[in-house]
Regions:
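Acidic/histidine-rich, metal-coordinating catalytic segments
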Residues: 279-283
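A contiguous, surface-exposed recognition patch within enzymatic or periplasmic domains that forms
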Residues: 243-252, 256-261
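Active-site microenvironments that recognize anionic phosphate/pyrophosphate groups
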Residues: 1-165, 171-243, 251, 265, ...
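Extended C-terminal subregions enriched in glycine
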Residues: 255-274, 278
C-alpha cells in the first residue's frame, strides 16, 4: 500500500463539527460484491386520485373524518399523534438511573398537493412555494406555543412512510430533541470560539472549493457535506445568515422552492426511481433567546447506495462504534451534480 494518503483509496475519518462526531470513510469497500437484501421497486404510475387513500381530497380518514376537497397544501392533526397537548408531569425521581420529564406537543400532517401521484420533484416551483408558505404559517403558529417545531418528510416505504400520498409532518414539542440540542451546543460553542456562525463559514468555504456542491441557485446551495454518513446525503443551506424559515425574504422563499425541485429531481434521476429519503429542517428554537449562533439548514438522508434496489444499512460497527461510508462525499457530489435537472418522467422521448 502506498505511503502517500489518497482520500479516494484509503480509509480515514472525517469530523462533523455540527454534531461533534466522527465518521469512518472506507472508499476501497465500494467495489465489494452485494448479495444481501434488495428493496422492492414499484414504478407503477399512481393515479392523481385514489378513492382508497386516507389523504386524498374528500376521502374518509381512518378515524372516520372526511378530508375537505382541498386544492392546495392541506394540514390536519395527526390521527396517531406521538405527542399530546396536555400531559401530566412525571413524578421527580431521586434515582439518577431512572429519570423522566414531561413531553407536551402536537403532531400534524401536511399533504403537499391534492394530486396523489405528485411528489415534490413532480410539483412545479409555484406549487412548492405554496408548501413553503404553509410551513412558515405553521412555524409561526406553533412556535408561539412550543420551543421546537420539526418540519420533516419521510419519502418512500424504505423510510417507513405509511401512506403513498405525498405528505410531510410537523411535530411541535415543549423540549429540545437530542439532535437539535447537540447542534445548538456546537453552533453556540463555535460562535464563542471563532466569533462567527459555523454554517455561514462552512457555506463560504464550500462555495470556494466547489467539489461537494450539487445544486446552486442565487440564494441557496445544496451540497454533500464533507462529513456525510449516508451515501447521497445532502445539506441544504442559504448563502447568508438566516435563523429560521419564517425570516426568509420573498425572493429567498421563491428560490428555496426552485432548489428543492432541482435537488429532489436529481435524486429521482440518479437511479430513475422515486428516491426515498428522510429530510427535515433545523433552525433556531423558539426559546426567547437571540440564537445568533443558529443557521437555518435542511438535512436529506437517503438510504440508496448502488441502485434503486440496494440500500445502506446502519448496523454492526455503525451501531456499536461509529458511522461508516464507502463512497466519498466528493464522489457522491460529482454523480449528483452531473445529473439532469429535468425529471426522467418528464423528458421528451
Amino acid at each position: 500500500m502506498s505511503d502517500i494518503f489518497e482520500p479516494t483509496e484509503h480509509p480515514h475519518r472525517r469530523y462533523n463539527p455540527l454534531i461533534d462526531q466522527w465518521v469512518l470513510v472506507s472508499p476501497h469497500r465500494a467495489k465489494r460484491p452485494w448479495q444481501g437484501q434488495q428493496e422492492k421497486v414499484n414504478e407503477e404510475q399512481k393515479p392523481s386520485y385514489d378513492p382508497t387513500c386516507y389523504l386524498c381530497p374528500s376521502n374518509k380518514r381512518i378515524t372516520g373524518e372526511l378530508n375537505p376537497d382541498y386544492r392546495k397544501p392541506y394540514v390536519f392533526k395527526n390521527d396517531f399523534s406521538a405527542l399530546l397537548e396536555d400531559t401530566p408531569v412525571p413524578e421527580k425521581s431521586s434515582d439518577p438511573l431512572f429519570q423522566s420529564s414531561q413531553a407536551r406537543g402536537e403532531s400534524r400532517v401536511i399533504c403537499f398537493s391534492p394530486d396523489h401521484s405528485k411528489t415534490l420533484p413532480l410539483l412545479t416551483a409555484l406549487e412548492i412555494e405554496e408548501v413553503i408558505k404553509v410551513w412558515q404559517e405553521q412555524l409561526r403558529e406553533l412556535g408561539a406555543k412550543y420551543q421546537w417545531v420539526q418540519i420533516f418528510e419521510n419519502k418512500g416505504t424504505a423510510m417507513g412512510c405509511s401512506n403513498p400520498h405525498p405528505h410531510g409532518q410537523i411535530w411541535a414539542n415543549s423540549f429540545l430533541p437530542n439532535e437539535v440540542a447537540r447542534e445548538d451546543r456546537t453552533q453556540r460553542d463555535y460562535l464563542l470560539k471563532h466569533g462567527s456562525v459555523m454554517l455561514v463559514d462552512y457555506v463560504k468555504r464550500e462555495l470556494e472549493l466547489k467539489e461537494r456542491i450539487v445544486v446552486e441557485t442565487e440564494h441557496w446551495v445544496a451540497l454533500v457535506p464533507y462529513w456525510a454518513v449516508w451515501p447521497f446525503e445532502t445539506l441544504l443551506l442559504p448563502k447568508t445568515h438566516v435563523k429560521r424559515l419564517t425570516e426568509l425574504s420573498n425572493e429567498q422563499s421563491k428560490d428555496l422552492a426552485v432548489i428543492l425541485k432541482k435537488l429532489t429531481t436529481k435524486y429521482d434521476n440518479l437511479f430513475e426511481t422515486s428516491f426515498p429519503y428522510s429530510m427535515g429542517f433545523h433552525a433556531a428554537p423558539f426559546n426567547g433567546e437571540d440564537n445568533e449562533h443558529w443557521q437555518l439548514h435542511a438535512h436529506f438522508y437517503p438510504p440508496l447506495l448502488r441502485s434503486a434496489t440496494v440500500r445502506k444499512f446502519m448496523v454492526g460497527y455503525e451501531m456499536l462504534g461509529e458511522s461508516q461510508r464507502d463512497l466519498t462525499a466528493e464522489q457522491a457530489a460529482e454523480r449528483l451534480r452531473a445529473l439532469s435537472e429535468v425529471h426522467y418522467k418528464e423528458r421528451t422521448k
